[in-house]
Regions:
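Flexible, solvent-exposed loop/hinge segments and secondary-structure transition points
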Residues: 2-188
């Protein structure tokens, strides 16, 4: 004869199922945590190399608070700063790494993460005309905003909000660069 279904039996079964599921999730975390961290570090290293002129050695890592937000940066002697800058785009947070040369010009930019609309705002990672506008851009001589707002940058077609967010992230990185080089403070 089968045991009567009681509250005690149901609670015991549910507890066992939860323990097994928790063990599986915990094991998956232990197995994947190091490869995920290594992949993130490799992406950061590749991004630093992509946004700064060629340099030797390992960049110094630091952070600085500017305008109420924390900015992580990497300083490569003789090459400039690679600064991680985030803003809100159309679909969510847009995070860039911006390479600012020692003379204050933008060497290059790259998108670290975004949640923009595929085929529209996501073109900020593939639209070569849009991305090339930032290479060699001198914020001291030009306005770092889209033409629709009186600036010198062409927006991505049908993605003005993303283009504005991208320009703002780059502009913020330039401001952080000046904070660091003009007597500001970072935790180097």
């Amino acid at each position: 004869m089968a045991a009567a279904s009681t509250l005690k039996n149901m609670a015991l079964c549910l507890t066992l199922v939860c323990l097994v599921c928790s063990a599986v999730v915990g094991a998956a975390y232990v197995v994947t945590v190091d490869p995920i961290a290594a992949a993130a570090q490799a992406k950061t290293t590749a991004s630093i190399a992509a946004v700064l002129p060629e340099f030797s050695g390992t960049p110094e890592q630091g952070s600085v608070e500017w305008n109420g937000a924390k900015y992580n940066y990497y300083k490569a002697d003789g090459a400039g700063y690679a600064i991680i800058s985030s803003t809100s785009g159309f679909g969510g947070v847009l995070t860039l790494m911006v390479g600012v040369a020692e003379d204050g010009t933008i060497h290059n930019t790259t998108v670290l993460s975004h949640s923009e609309t595929p085929g529209l705002g996501a073109k900020c990672t593939t639209d070569e005309h849009f991305m090339s506008q930032f290479r060699g851009f001198d914020p001291a001589a030009k306005t770092l905003s889209v033409k629709k707002d009186g600036g010198d940058l062409d927006a991505i077609t049908a993605s003005t909000i993303t283009s504005r967010a991208y320009a703002l992230a780059v502009s913020n990185a330039v401001a952080v660069f000046h904070e660091l080089t003009d007597g500001g403070q970072g935790d180097e």
